[in-house]
Structure formats: C-alpha cells, structure tokens
UniProtKB/Swiss-Prot annotation:
It comes from Caenorhabditis elegans. Residues 72-143 are annotated as: Disordered. Disruption phenotype: RNAi-mediated knockdown abolishes expression of tyrosine monooxygenase cat-2 in neurons in the male-specific genital sensilla (simple sense organs) known as rays. It is found in: Nucleus; Cell projection, Neuron projection. Keywords: Cell projection, DNA-binding, Nucleus, Transcription, Transcription regulation. This is Transcription factor ast-1. The gene is ast-1. GO terms for molecular function: DNA-binding transcription factor activity, RNA polymerase II-specific; sequence-specific DNA binding. PROSITE patterns: ETS_DOMAIN_1, ETS_DOMAIN_2, ETS_DOMAIN_3.
Length: 377
C-alpha cells in the first residue's frame, strides 16, 4: 500500500470519504483514504471486465472492417467450451474452432491468429490509484484474452485438421461451387451448332439444281456451301441468314462467273432485289450486307409451272401436244357437206313454203320464175 501525503490530495475530496478517528493524526487519515480508493478502483475494474466478457454470444468480429453483429440464426455457440460453428450456405463449409485445434496449434499458427480485445479506458481514476488498479487487473486480462482468440483454422474445410496445405485446395474447390463449376459444365453442353454442317448439304444441292445457266442466288449458295469462302461470305445462324463480309469480292467473283469484269456490288445488289418478289431471299433490316434465304420460296420456284389460266393451254407445250391430232387432216372438202336434195333450187323458196315474195307473177324483176339457190356448184 502506498502512502501519500495530505498535500497531494485532490481538492474535490469529500469529507465523507475521510474516516477520522479521535486522537489520530492526519497522516493516518490519508492512509485510510488511499486504502478506500484502491478498493473502489479494483471494484470498478472488475465490473468493467465482467461487462466485457458478458457481451452477446454472437457479438465479436472476425476481421477488421467486418460488421460487428452477425445474425443469431447463423451463429451457434456453446458457452461451456466456447465452441463456435457456422454453416455457410454459399459454400457448405463448417467454420468451427474447438479445443483440439487450438491445443495442437504450433507457434506458426499462433502468429497467424487474429486477436480481438474489447478494452475501455478508465477515466474516473488518476494518479497512483489508477496505476495500482491497472497493475492489479493485468493477470485477469491475460486469462480472459483467450476468449477473443479466433484461429485461422476456422476457415478449414474439416474441423480440427492439422494440415493447412491440405485445406487450401479444399477451400478453393468449395468456394468456386457457385461461381465456376456451373459455368464450366454449361459451356460445353450448350455449344452453338455449326451452320455449315446443317445448311451445307442443302445449299450445295440447291446451288446445282435445275438446268441452264447459274443464277445469282445459286452462286451465293455455292459460296456458302464451302467454308473456305467464309472470309467473304458467311452464314449467320441456322435460319438461312447470311452476310456479305466482303461484298466487293463477292461481286468480283460473280463477274468472273458471268464474264463481266465491270461487275460491282451496286450492280449485284440490284440483281438481288429481283429475288425479293420471287420469295427467294429478303433483306435483313437493321443489318448491313445481311440477307436471308427463304428455302420454301426456293422450293416453289424450282417446281415446274402448271396451267392455271385458259391462255396457258395455247402455249408452246400445249400446242405441241395438240399438233399430232391435226396432222392427219388435209384440206377440207366442203362439197361433201351438201345434203342430198338441197342442191336443186326448185325445192327452196317456192310458193309451197309460203315465200310469196319470191313466187309472185307479173313482177318487173321477173320473180315469177322459181329462184334457184345452188349450193357450191
């Protein structure tokens, strides 16, 4: 116990704090006051230490900068062994610390631990009384410090494991469950189909269909059927859409096929507009140099025409079928059409059939005689 003189007493000391006994000197009173102050300081520090250890069971942080409060439904504590376990619903990890893992930790593990202390400064006492109070509570503070030690082994995939090198790949594998595993599995199963494998045989057959000269739409299908020309013209998907990557080069190749060295894209694009009304292809709106084939329209265009109007029966094909029917006919002998008995004029327009105008007598135009109308004499 340290004895202080009366000269060093603070001016704010109340008279009730001094226990004055009759017949004693003032130095004994000062010693009694110092003993009372020391007891009060120890009681206050014990109350502060109890308040520090009486924090809620989920109210201390893992790292600097993290939130101090964790939801109670995620943190479970056992007050007897101070064992903490947390199930992370993202990675499925069991984050826990136990006495076995902390007991087997080496000096290297002690260096990697993060210690968190909850300290509060003593602002009520000063002087020698505060110094003695801090020295008296140092041993109790060290005994309570293990409560706030959070081992880095809590982030191991298996509780109580001794090998940290073994836990690192396990943690990386579990942490990438929702970020990398699904992405890698989905990237191979949903690959885009190759349009050249799907549309290649069809475009090749249509490019060489029909007889006669190759048309422009057939020439484009011929280029699209060969993947070597993908640098100048290529498919855009599997629905018949294609794009002229180098329209000038496509026009030059079309000019070589038609022996027209002055061919350019402007002339070729005008020829492509002719196929819009034929439902062979169409321009893709909003995209430059993009077109789309209509395979149903191409199939209808390749079908032979059928006679749907009366004038279609008198075309060259119809007349070719009718000509053999008239080949055996010669010049018409219309005299064979005369019926017997009608070549005599007396039997036609005589008075017996009431044609009086022709049978009247005494007329000036000599109509009394029977008029004969010979037929093809």
């Amino acid at each position: 116990m340290q004895v202080v003189s009366s000269a060093t007493l603070p001016p704010t000391v109340a008279s009730a704090d001094l226990a004055i006994v009759g017949g004693r000197s003032s130095d004994e009173d000062v010693i009694k006051y110092s003993a009372i102050q020391t007891i009060k300081q120890e009681q206050q520090q014990q109350q502060q230490q109890q308040s520090n250890t009486a924090l809620p069971s989920y109210n201390f942080p893992f790292f600097n900068g993290m939130q101090n409060d964790f939801p109670p439904n995620r943190m479970l504590y056992n007050d007897n062994t101070m064992q903490k376990s947390e199930n992370d619903h993202f990675t499925g990890m069991n984050l826990s610390t136990s006495a076995s893992s902390s007991g087997n930790s080496t000096s290297s593990k002690d260096q990697s631990r993060r210690q968190f202390y909850t300290e509060s400064s003593n602002s009520s006492g000063n002087g020698a009384a505060a110094t003695s109070g801090s020295n008296g509570s140092s041993s109790s503070t060290e005994s309570k410090s293990d409560v706030f030690n959070i081992s880095m082994n809590a982030f191991a995939a298996t509780p109580g494991s001794k090998s940290e090198d073994h836990n690192i790949p396990s943690f990386n594998m579990l942490s990438s469950y929702y970020t990398g595993a699904l992405k890698l599995s989905n990237s191979t199963s949903f690959a885009n189909p190759d349009p050249y494998q799907i549309l290649g045989p069809t475009s090749k057959n249509l490019a060489h269909s029909g007889s006669g000269q190759t048309q422009l739409w057939q020439f484009l299908l011929e280029l699209l059927s060969d993947k070597r020309y993908s640098e100048v013209i290529t498919w855009e998907g599997t629905q018949g859409e294609f794009k002229l990557v180098d329209p000038d080069e496509v026009a030059r190749k079309w000019g070589e096929r038609k022996s027209k060295p002055n061919m350019n894209y402007d002339k070729m694009s005008r020829a492509l507009r002719y196929y819009y009304d034929k439902n062979i292809m169409a321009k893709v709106h909003g995209k430059r140099y993009a077109y789309k084939f209509d395979f149903q329209g191409i199939a209808q265009a390749l079908q032979p025409p059928t006679a749907s109007h009366p004038q279609d029966y008198f075309n060259s094909h119809a007349m070719g079928r009718i000509a053999p029917d008239f080949s055996s006919w010669t010049s018409a002998n219309y005299r064979s059409l005369n019926i017997a008995g009608f070549n005599n004029g007396s039997t036609i327009f005589n008075p017996s059939v009431n044609y009086s105008a022709f049978g009247a007598t005494g007329t000036s135009n000599n109509l009394s005689a029977a008029r004969a109308f010979p037929l093809y004499r």
